[in-house]
């Protein structure tokens, strides 16, 4: 994918959202670090795990890239993927400030719903939407609604994964699907604005 951001939901949207959610979760992942590493290896996108962030200095003074995407080496310029990782890091920092607004009871309820094997993906998205409705009152008044919704969606995913690390894969998939269905135009605009 070049520097142009995808317009619709599809492979481009999934790529962007996978990177965004993974990057958000990777910040402060102490409770589910191993599960996140496994997930990162399974994703069909370039993800940065700890240790991948530092490029080695070469003898000619340039930095060697460790960027791989589907087995191909990607260019060294600040790519869309790097922009998305930076956005994820920024959103995770904002999420740290909102962390207290999510009640442990809500996290336990959402985790229990995700553990219910009979729920469809749509049912899980609906459970996530209901949980978001419960925390809407705690959105900061000075923050755009879409930004607050995006942060809280990923923050709920992080809290459920922290509560029950075995749910990480399901929570990740549901979160990506929820964002692609409800918030992708906002995510796309965030990426476009950062790339300009």
UniProtKB/Swiss-Prot annotation:
Intact BH3 motif is required by BIK, BID, BAK, BAD and BAX for their pro-apoptotic activity and for their interaction with anti-apoptotic members of the Bcl-2 family. GO terms for biological process: apoptotic mitochondrial changes; establishment of protein localization to membrane; extrinsic apoptotic signaling pathway; glial cell apoptotic process; hepatocyte apoptotic process; mitochondrial ATP synthesis coupled electron transport; mitochondrial outer membrane permeabilization; negative regulation of intrinsic apoptotic signaling pathway in response to DNA damage. This is BH3-interacting domain death agonist. The record marks 60-61, 76-77, 99-100 as: Cleavage. The lineage of its organism: Eukaryota, Metazoa, Chordata, Craniata, Vertebrata. It is found in: Cytoplasm; Mitochondrion membrane; Mitochondrion outer membrane. The modification Phosphoserine is found at residue 79. Induces caspases and apoptosis. Counters the protective effect of BCL2. Keywords: Acetylation, Apoptosis, Cytoplasm, Membrane, Mitochondrion, Mitochondrion outer membrane, Phosphoprotein, Ubl conjugation. Forms heterodimers either with the pro-apoptotic protein BAX or the anti-apoptotic protein BCL2. Interacts with PLEKHN1. GO terms for cellular component: cytoplasm; cytosol; membrane; mitochondrial membrane; mitochondrial outer membrane; mitochondrion. A motif (BH3) lies at residues 87-101. The modification N-acetylmethionine is found at residue 1. It comes from Rattus norvegicus. It comes from the Eukaryota. One of its GO terms (molecular function) is ubiquitin protein ligase binding. The keyword Acetylation applies. The keyword Endoplasmic reticulum does not apply. The gene is Bid. Signal peptide: none annotated.
